[in-house]
Amino acid sequence: MGLEAVIDEITEKGRKEAEAIRKESETEVAQVLAAANVKSDQIKTAVDEDVARQEARIINQEVSAANLLVKRSQLNAEKSLLDQVYAAVLLEVRGASPDFHRAALSSLLQQARAEIGEGMIHASARDLPMVQTLLKEGSYPGFVAGSPVDIDGGIIAESRDGLLQVDYSYRTFLDRVWESGLKNASDILFG
């Protein structure tokens, strides 16, 4: 074998080894790229899912905030309307006929007599003359008319020693009725 044949054989062997190394490298590169693509797809999918979750959470928060704002506005409007109804009822009671006030005051005096027995009866400046008349006409011994007080109607009964005061004012009765019937009134007005 000549030197040229040895050189050709070595060259051929080197070329084959280089080709094998190149093919092995290409296979390795293809595997690394495939793994990188899989990992990249996994990361992209995870990011997309996270973005979708964050978007849904933000939308839910915004919807909840908007619903709360609407509910608050609705409740404020309902409260305003209920306050107007309360004021209208109180105005209507204040403006009732003298016969109504006389009957109401007579009934309240009977309640005061049953609860405290004797004492002083205070009333609004409008009702005080009627209270004085009822005290003189009725069977209310031990009760005297007191000074006028700032109430819409009704009476304030005070024991003789001043330790007990019972509020029979129209506003107090209206407040009791209002508190006990507020849910029903709200249901009727606002469904």
UniProtKB/Swiss-Prot annotation:
It holds the Pfam family vATP-synt_E. The keyword Transport applies. The keyword Membrane applies. Keywords: ATP synthesis, Cell membrane, Hydrogen ion transport, Ion transport, Membrane, Transport. It is found in: Cell membrane. GO terms for biological process: proton motive force-driven plasma membrane ATP synthesis. It is a peripheral membrane protein. One of its GO terms (cellular component) is plasma membrane. GO terms for molecular function: ATP binding; proton-transporting ATP synthase activity, rotational mechanism; proton-transporting ATPase activity, rotational mechanism. Component of the A-type ATP synthase that produces ATP from ADP in the presence of a proton gradient across the membrane. Belongs to the V-ATPase E subunit family. Has multiple subunits with at least A(3), B(3), C, D, E, F, H, I and proteolipid K(x). This is A-type ATP synthase subunit E. It comes from Methanosphaerula palustris (strain ATCC BAA-1556 / DSM 19958 / E1-9c).
